[in-house]
Amino acid sequence: MSDGRTALFPGTFDPFTNGHLDLTRRAASLFGRVIVAVAPSPGKGTLFSVEERVALIQSATRSMKRVEVVAFSDLVVDCARRLGAQVMIRGLRAVSDFEYEFQMALMNRRLSPSVEVVFMMPSQEYSYLNSTLVKEVARLGGDVHGLVPQIVETQLKARYGAASAGARKSAGAAQTAGASSARKPSAKAARKSSAPSSRKRR
């Protein structure tokens, strides 16, 4: 049963995984309104644009009535205040996440004491998942089925499939050019082979 408060779930979500989806669904059962807030993260260099990520998350959470998806570029606490959120959701996958998240929670509390940080652990089946790992598996042609929502899986395959096809095409063109160059004699070699021999026949 929800308590009526608005919860903000911020992140880069590049891409949105089933771990993120699990936390979103569970947060929606606890709070009256959940806002998934997508950050641009220009320092990281993302696979999908902010607009693409927002659209993918909207599609993945379409059946969740209490969930909204927005983009933001200001401080997360400012975003929370602007959208009327009283709670900020943060996921903890493992002990290794705790130190960073604890520091961030203390900083956010200093900046905005009225916004309460709530830590949530994902379901055990998603406890190892993170976006970087999913992208690496997809980039190398691995199966990401069950790791991300279906719409995200489709877009990952399209994105990395196109990149792989382009790389194979470039490699093939380079090999063809190399083979052609190897078969074609140089101008200097051609002149040398056509010049009369100065040696006398014995």
Model-inferred region functions:
Residues 1-202:
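Nucleotidyltransferase catalytic core that binds NTPs
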